[in-house]
Each structure stands twice: as structure tokens, then as C-alpha cells.
């Protein structure tokens, strides 16, 4: 690792460099080669010409590109030729003594020293002509000539325009021609109108049953409540009742063309026979049960006992209803009838608790 990289620089570094440069020996190479490079005074004339030319160039910038020079004699003046003077180079003499400072000249001295040229009075006609270039004026002149020639040629082709009034015969002939043209146009119009009517599609009427759906806005139906009004007999004013405006609602209607279509979409259901509900003779309530012997409906167990007690009393007094039937029918009863009667008797003889 280099120690010089980490070392801090000295405070007096570079103090003697200016003295070494001043004590440096002059080299003869710069004095002999190419005639020497020592500077010589004597360029005052060159500097004056250059400053004058620079002033002239600056003044030219004020003129627009499209404007022509104000005076014609300025173009005839000979242009000054700039010459470049090359002299031998001489090394400047280095002096240890400080050079005295020159007083600064005011910047506007050169501008004031220049003689001001008297301005020529402006001429409107000259300025307007000089603002346009020669090429522009030439093109404008040629265009004007071409337009004029075309106008002359068009007048020659048209010939003289005669404004002679027409005679009565000429007017009648012209009216006949106009009439024929109008008749032809009318015939064409009628033919086109007939063709258009043929092409119009006629509305087809639906054959057969139809169903029409119609929706509309209708006023809302409200219930009218009658209010009692107190009538004043003495002739005082009656109290006016407030009328509330009813709202509106939407209603839809479906219309069928015939009854058959309506019945096909909305068939009528067959009404069945309504079964009459039995009523208990004891409690006068809807019966829930039925006695198998007497075939009397009853509501609960209490009603059932009352019905059976009445049935027993009827048997003791009047006898069985099947025995009475047997006496009326006589002894020629079939065996089947006897068997059924016996079964009934056995069935009736079993009392239910």
C-alpha cells in the first residue's frame, strides 16, 4: 500500500511554483522558427477597418428581407476589400512590475463619434413599390393579362346579346312546347304513382278467432262516502265539501272474439253435488259418528247412550221392526229372508255399553 495516498497534503504545497515559472529560461526556438512569434504593434489600421465593417453589418440587420435598399446609388459603391496582415510572432516581454490599469472608455463613445446621415423624406409611392419584389410584380402583371384575354375570348364566343322582345306568334309557339312538356311529365307522374300504390302492402285481416290485449290508463275508482250537510234554513251559505282528485291507474283488458275461444282457454269446471253434513239430533252439532243399528248420526258418547236408551224403549213397547215385517208378509217367507232376519236379530240383541 502506498503511504502517499493516506498522507494529508502540506499546507505550503505549490507556493514556489510561481517563482519557478518566472525564472524559466527563454528558448531560442520561438525566436528563430518561422520568423519568430513576437507580437508587433501596428494593427491599428486593420482594427479600424474591421470595426467600420462590423458597424456596417449591424446596420444592415435593421432592413427586412423583402425590402429593397432605399437608394439606388448605394449598390454602385465599391466594397472595401478586407486584407489580412500576417507578421512574425514575437514572444511578449514578461515584466515583473504590475502594469498600470487603463481607464475604461465609455461604451457609447464609438456610437456618438459616427456621423449621422440625414434621413430622406418618405415617399408613399416609392415605398409601396419597393416593398414588393420584381418577381412578384411580374407575376401579378402576367396574371392580370391572362384574365383579361379570357374575358375577351368569352365575349367573342357568346356573340352579341339581343334583347329583342318576342312577338305574339313566338310566344304562342313557346307556350305549345311548354304544354307538351308538362303533359308528358304529368303522365310520367301518374304512372309512377300507380306503380307505388300497387306496391303498398295491404293490411291482412286475421281469419278466425282472435284474442286482443289492450292496456290503458284510467282514473282510480274510489269509494264515495256520503257526508251529511247541515242545511241552514235562514238562507246562509252552505259549507262546500272538498273534492279530492282521484289518481290514475293502469288497466289491461283481454278480449276474445267468440265464446268458444273463451271456453277453450277458460273451461268451466263441473259442479259436483255438495254433501249435506249430518247433524246430531241430541246436541244439534255436526255429527261425527253414525249408529250402525239405528243409522242415526251422533256427536259424542253421551248422545250415543241417549239414542240407544230410546231405541230399547221403542223395542219393548212396539217390538222389533223386522218381526212386524214378518207378520205382514205371512208364513211364505223364503229361507234367505229368515236367515237375514235372524242375523239382524242377533246383531240387535247385542247391546253396546
Curated annotation (Swiss-Prot):
Region (Disordered) spans which residues?
Answer: 1-143
Q: Which residues cross the membrane?
A: none
State any GO BP term from the record.
transcription initiation-coupled chromatin remodeling
Q: Which GO terms describe its cellular component?
A: nucleus
Biased composition, class Basic and acidic residues, residue ranges = 70-79, 113-143
State the Gene Ontology terms under molecular function.
DNA binding; histone chaperone activity
Subcellular localization(s) per the UniProt record: Nucleus
Q: Which family does it belong to?
A: Belongs to the VPS72/YL1 family.
Q: What binding partners and quaternary form does the record give? A: Component of the NuA4 histone acetyltransferase complex.
Q: What does this protein do?
A: Deposition-and-exchange histone chaperone specific for H2AZ1, specifically chaperones H2AZ1 and deposits it into nucleosomes. As component of the SRCAP complex, mediates the ATP-dependent exchange of histone H2AZ1/H2B dimers for nucleosomal H2A/H2B, leading to transcriptional regulation of selected genes by chromatin remodeling.
Q: Output the superkingdom of the source species.
A: Eukaryota
Quote the biased-composition stretches of kind Acidic residues, using this chain's numbering: 54-69
Calcium as UniProt keyword: no
Name of this protein: Vacuolar protein sorting-associated protein 72 homolog
Q: Which InterPro entries match?
A: Vps72/YL1_C, YL1_N
Give the keywords, sorted.
Answer: Chromatin regulator, DNA-binding, Nucleus, Transcription, Transcription regulation
Origin organism is Xenopus laevis
Point out the DNA-binding stretch(es). Answer: 155-205
